[in-house]
Each structure stands twice: as structure tokens, then as C-alpha cells.
Amino acid sequence: MFETLENLLQLIILSVCAAVSLLSALKSRKRPHMLLFFFYLSYLLGDIYWQVCLFYFEETPRISVVSDLSWYAAYLFLYLLIMTEGGNKHKNGRLAACAVKAFPVLMALFYMQWGEILSNIIYALIMGLLFSRITGVLFSKTGKTGGRRLRWLCLTAMIFCLAEYASWTSSCFWDVDALRYTYYADDLLMTLCFPFFIAALKAAPGEADA
């Protein structure tokens, strides 16, 4: 019952965020707002497919490629959004860059015990790119961490991605009650992150954004 309510809450929040970002994109005609809309829309489509399968078949989708493709696209749009806001101007040091890219790879190897190999490889590649840009902005070796809007955007993206990883990890141990509740908490944290992407784009630009 709790899972159903949490999933419904995520669908509602995603729908509202998609509508708000679309209106902002049409009003401002700026690329960041359009990319944010596509991020929401892609994630929403993946969620809808997943929930339809749960509702009609009372089990997770046997053909998960449909939802996976939607979520791949969502993370790529988030990556493009960060790049558009200036994330390509910030880089990690060599050691930090290796550590950031190693994390998604190690997690993918861990998840392969339960999930599809190809899907985990794709997620590792996408998350490696995304984490590189996020940490490059938040922990830039040059000391220039970007403008206020970019920092808030990357901070929200970091929390969102880490919550996603936490929920994936918890789902691997679904039979353990304590970790199952952790999964719900992680998924709820992800849901609550969605509106903050809109708030981040509405933040006044700092010096590095100008």
C-alpha cells in the first residue's frame, strides 16, 4: 500500500514538474528549460510504463527495455542541461576523475548479479559522464565552482543520483525488511528532488553564470 502511494506521489509530482517546465520553456524559449522538460517527460514515461505493468500484471515488467530507454534518455537530458549551464568548463583532477568514473563501474558490476549486463553497462557509462560533470562543478580543482544556478543544479543532481543508487542497492535485498523500508525512503528522496531542479534554474545567476 505504501509503495503504491509513493509511486502515485512520484507520478503526480513528475507530471506537475513537466507541465511547469514546459510552460517555462514556451514562455522563455530558453534551452535549459526545454532540456529540463524533456528530462521530466522521459522519466515520467518510464515510470508510467513501470506502474502500468505493476497494476495490470502485479509484477515488475518482464521487458524492462521500454522503461530503461526512457530513464537513459532522462539522465542524458540532465547531463545536457548541466553542460548547457556551463558544466563543460569545470573538470576534476586526474585522481578524482578516475575515482568518479570508477564508482559507476563498480556499482554496475555489483548490480550485474541481479540485473541485465547490457543495461548496467549503459547506466555505468551515462552515470560516469554525469558524475564527472557534477563533481567537476562542485569540487573544481581550479577553485571556480560555477555560478549559483549551476551549483544548485549540480547539487540537486548529485543528491538525486545518489538516492537513485541507494534505491537500486536496497532493491537488491528486497527480502530484508529493513532495507525494503530504506528503498521507500530513497525513492521518496528522489521524488522530492524533482521540484528542486526547477528551483535551481530559477535561481539568480552568480558571477560565473553572467
Predicted regions located by residue number:
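Internal transmembrane alpha-helix with an interfacial aromatic "cap," most often the third helix
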Residues: 17-28, 54-62, 66-100, 108, ...
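C-terminal transmembrane-bundle signature of multipass membrane proteins
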Residues: 79, 131-210
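Short aromatic-rich membrane-water interface segments that cap or initiate transmembrane helices
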Residues: 1-5, 61-70, 180-185
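Membrane-interface helix caps and helix-loop-helix hairpins in membrane proteins
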Residues: 55-62, 109-121, 173-177
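Hydrophobic alpha-helical transmembrane segments of multi-pass membrane proteins
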Residues: 9-21, 32-56, 67-75, 104-107, ...
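Generic alpha-helical transmembrane segments
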Residues: 71-77, 119-134, 190-191
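Hydrophobic transmembrane alpha-helical segments in integral membrane proteins
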Residues: 1-17, 113-124, 183-184
